[in-house]
C-alpha cells in the first residue's frame, strides 16, 4: 500500500497494469489519445507486485485489480469507471486539474 | 404334425413354385427346392423347422420394414413442424442460428435462451417506440415524453444486463452477432453498434441545436470514437497475444514429453479468451454511457426524436436484411 501511494503520487497520471492485460492496453491507449503520458507500472514485473495487486483489489472493491488508474494521486477506478468518466467529459477535466494535460 | 401346420399341405401339393413362400423371400425358395431334391412330397423335421424359421424371419423383416416406414413418416411430420416454426419465427423477425454451431458451443442452450430473450426485448422496444412516436405526433408535453424516454433508457440498461449474462455463458455467440440479422451483423462492433456511428447519423435529424448542444454532440461523438478505438486496440493485442501463446513451442519441440507444456499453453490461451467477456462488457458500458450522455446534452423532445431515429434506423436495417434474403436469385 505504501509503495502504491508512493508511485501513484509521483506523476499526474499513473496506471498500474500487467503486461498480459489487454484491457490495460485499451486504457493506456485512451490516455495516450487524450494526450496524457501516464506512468505505467506493470505488477508482474515488480518484485512487490503481489502485495500491490492485493492492495489495489481492496481499493477498487468490486473492480478487478488492474488496470488501476490514479490521477493527481487519487484512485479513479478501473476500465469501467475510466470509460464512463471519459464519455461524460469528467476524465478530461480531472487530467486538466492534475496538470496531466493542458488543453 | 402335418395337420398342425397349414403350410405343410401346400408344400406337398406343389413345392417347386410356391406363391405363398415365394413372397417371403429367396431363402424360402431355396428351402423349398431343397426339399424337392431330397424327397418329393415328403418333408422331414429339419425342413419343416427351416421353413418355420424362414417364416419367422420374414415376419420380423416385415415388422422392421413397417417400423422403418413409420419412423420415416414421423420424421417427415417433425420436419414439417420445424419448417412451420421456422417460418413463424422468421415472420416475427427472430433469427434462429444454425444448429451446427450450437451443438459445438458449450452454451448451446444459453445461446438459444439469449436469442429468445433478445427477441422479447425487441418486441417490448417496438411497443415503447410506437408509444413514443404517437406521443411526439400528438405534441405531448415534456413531462409525458420524459417518462417514455426514461423508460426507453431503462430498457437499454436491461438489454446490456441480458447481454452481460449471456456473455458469461457463450461469449462467442454474442461476438458472432448470430442473434442479429445479416445486415446488422455487417456493422457489428464488439457484439453491438458503434455509438460514434449512430451519433453521426443523428446530427442532421436534431436541428435546430444550440451552439452548446452542437459542441456537446460533436465532443461525444469524438470521445466515444476514442473509446471505441482504445477497446479495438485492446482486442488486437488480445488476438496477438493469443496467437503468440498458441504458436509458441510448436516448432522443433519433440512430440513426446510435451503434454504438460501443451496443457499449460492451452490453459494460458483459455485465460486470455476469458478476457473477451470483459471487452463485450466495456463496449456495452460505452454504448450505455454514450446514450446517457446524449440525453444529458439534448432537450427532452430532442432526446425522444433521437431515440426514435436510432430505432427507425435499426428497423430499416433489419427490413433491408429481410428484403435482401428474399430477393429473387437466378
Curated annotation (Swiss-Prot), chain A:
One of its GO terms (cellular component) is cytoplasm. Disulfide bonds join 21-24. Keywords: Cytoplasm, Disulfide bond, Electron transport, Redox-active center, Transport. GO terms for biological process: negative regulation of transcription by RNA polymerase II; response to nitrate. Residues 1-102 form the Glutaredoxin domain. Its main location: cytoplasm. The keyword GTP-binding does not apply. Pfam families: Glutaredoxin (PF00462). Transmembrane segments: none annotated. The keyword Chaperone does not apply. CDD domains: GRX_GRXh_1_2_like. SUPFAM superfamilies: Thioredoxin-like. It is found in: Cytoplasm. Belongs to the glutaredoxin family. CC-type subfamily. Has a glutathione-disulfide oxidoreductase activity in the presence of NADPH and glutathione reductase. Reduces low molecular weight disulfides and proteins. This is Glutaredoxin-C11. The gene is GRXC11.
Curated annotation (Swiss-Prot), chain B:
It is found in: Nucleus. Residues 111-327 form the DOG1 domain. Residues 46-66 are annotated as: Basic motif. GO terms for molecular function: DNA binding; DNA-binding transcription factor activity; transcription cis-regulatory region binding. Keywords: Activator, Coiled coil, DNA-binding, Hypersensitive response, Nucleus, Plant defense, Transcription, Transcription regulation. Residues 1-48 are annotated as: Disordered. InterPro entries: bZIP, bZIP_sf, TGA_domain. It holds the Pfam family bZIP_1. Residues 44-107 form the bZIP domain. Belongs to the bZIP family. Transcriptional activator that binds specifically to the DNA sequence 5'-TGACG-3'. Recognizes ocs elements like the as-1 motif of the cauliflower mosaic virus 35S promoter. Binding to the as-1-like cis elements mediate auxin- and salicylic acid-inducible transcription. Required to induce the systemic acquired resistance (SAR) via the regulation of pathogenesis-related genes expression. Binding to the as-1 element of PR-1 promoter is salicylic acid-inducible and mediated by NPR1. Could also bind to the C-boxes (5'-ATGACGTCAT-3') with high affinity. This is Transcription factor TGA2.
Amino acid at each position: 500500500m505504501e509503495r502504491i501511494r508512493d508511485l501513484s503520487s509521483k506523476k499526474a497520471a499513473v496506471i498500474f497494469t500487467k503486461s498480459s492485460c489487454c484491457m490495460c492496453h485499451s486504457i493506456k491507449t485512451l490516455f495516450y489519445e487524450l494526450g496524457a503520458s501516464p506512468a505505467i507500472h506493470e505488477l508482474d514485473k515488480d518484485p512487490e507486485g503481489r502485495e500491490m495487486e492485493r492492495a489495489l483489489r481492496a481499493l477498487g472493491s468490486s473492480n478487478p485489480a488492474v488496470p488501476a488508474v490514479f490521477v493527481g494521486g487519487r484512485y479513479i477506478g478501473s476500465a469501467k469507471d475510466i470509460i464512463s468518466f471519459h464519455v461524460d467529459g469528467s476524465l478530461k477535466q480531472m487530467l486538466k486539474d492534475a496538470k496531466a494535460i493542458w488543453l | 404334425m402335418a395337420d398342425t401346420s397349414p403350410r405343410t399341405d401346400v408344400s406337398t401339393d406343389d413345392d417347386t413354385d410356391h406363391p405363398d413362400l415365394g413372397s417371403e423371400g429367396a431363402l424360402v425358395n431355396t428351402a423349398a427346392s431343397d426339399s424337392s431334391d431330397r424327397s418329393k412330397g415328403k418333408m422331414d423335421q429339419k425342413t419343416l423347422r427351416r421353413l418355420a424359421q424362414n417364416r419367422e424371419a420374414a415376419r420380423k423383416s416385415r415388422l422392421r420394414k413397417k417400423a422403418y416406414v413409420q419412423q420415416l413418416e414421423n420424421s417427415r411430420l417433425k420436419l414439417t413442424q420445424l419448417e412451420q416454426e421456422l417460418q413463424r419465427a422468421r415472420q416475427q423477425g427472430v433469427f434462429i442460428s444454425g444448429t451446427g454451431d450450437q451443438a459445438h458451443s458449450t452454451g448451446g442452450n444459453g445461446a438459444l435462451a439469449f436469442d429468445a430473450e433478445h427477441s422479447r426485448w425487441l418486441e417490448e422496444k417496438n411497443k415503447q417506440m410506437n408509444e413514443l412516436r404517437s406521443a411526439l405526433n400528438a405534441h405531448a408535453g415534456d413531462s409525458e415524453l420524459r417518462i417514455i424516454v426514461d423508460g426507453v433508457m431503462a430498457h437499454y440498461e436491461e438489454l446490456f444486463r441480458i447481454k452481460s449474462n449471456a456473455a458469461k455463458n457463450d461469449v462467442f455467440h454474442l461476438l458472432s452477432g448470430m442473434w442479429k440479422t445479416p445486415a446488422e451483423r455487417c456493422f457489428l462492433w464488439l457484439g453491438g453498434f458503434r455509438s460514434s456511428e449512430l451519433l453521426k447519423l443523428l446530427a442532421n435529424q436534431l436541428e435546430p441545436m444550440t451552439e452548446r448542444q452542437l459542441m456537446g454532440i460533436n465532443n461525444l461523438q469524438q470521445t466515444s470514437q476514442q473509446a471505441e478505438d482504445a477497446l479495438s486496440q485492446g482486442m488486437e493485442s488480445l488476438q496477438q497475444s493469443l496467437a503468440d501463446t498458441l504458436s509458441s513451442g510448436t516448432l522443433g519441440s519433440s512430440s513426446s514429453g510435451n503434454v504438460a507444456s501443451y496443457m499449460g499453453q492451452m490453459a494460458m490461451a483459455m485465460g486470455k479468451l476469458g478476457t473477451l467477456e470483459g471487452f463485450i462488457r466495456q463496449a456495452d458500458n460505452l454504448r450505455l454511457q454514450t446514450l446517457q450522455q446524449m440525453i444529458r446534452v439534448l432537450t427532452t423532445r430532442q432526446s425522444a426524436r433521437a431515440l426514435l431515429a436510432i430505432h427507425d434506423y435499426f428497423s430499416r436495417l433489419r427490413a433491408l436484411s429481410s428484403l435482401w434474403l428474399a430477393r429473387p436469385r437466378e
